[in-house]
């Protein structure tokens, strides 16, 4: 999916799970704030919201016995490894890659669990 401009969650990213959609909005906001201010504080905040969201989402998958939990968790872990490797100020290329990752992850990976959690 194309990166939304301005960079924000839109109904195109709706998973049908309000708690997950709310957290996805926070992820978009976190990356947008990081792109605007690009401080260590904003980087730490972005890492924190991604960590919390992935924990919540994966917990929901486990409780629902979602068949692709391990595969999905591995994808999350790969992105977290990338984010934790960022240093402030985060280069624009890395920010763009992170924004693209999120904008693509939701419709290509998260949509797979629609109706299954």
From Swiss-Prot:
Fe cation 2 binds at residues 57, 72, 76, 105, 110. Fe cation 1 binds at residues 24, 53, 57, 110. The lineage of its organism: Eukaryota, Metazoa, Spiralia, Lophotrochozoa, Brachiopoda. Belongs to the hemerythrin family. CDD domains: Hemerythrin (cd12107). It comes from Lingula anatina (Brachiopod). Hemerythrin is a respiratory protein in blood cells of certain marine worms. The oxygen-binding site in each chain contains two iron atoms. Keywords: Iron, Metal-binding, Oxygen transport, Transport. InterPro entries: Haemerythrin, Haemerythrin_Fe_BS, Hemerythrin, Hemerythrin-like, Hemerythrin-like_sf, Hemerythrin_metal-bd. GO terms for molecular function: iron ion binding; oxygen carrier activity. The keyword Iron applies. Octamer composed of two types of chains: alpha and beta. This is Hemerythrin subunit beta. The keyword Cytoplasm does not apply.
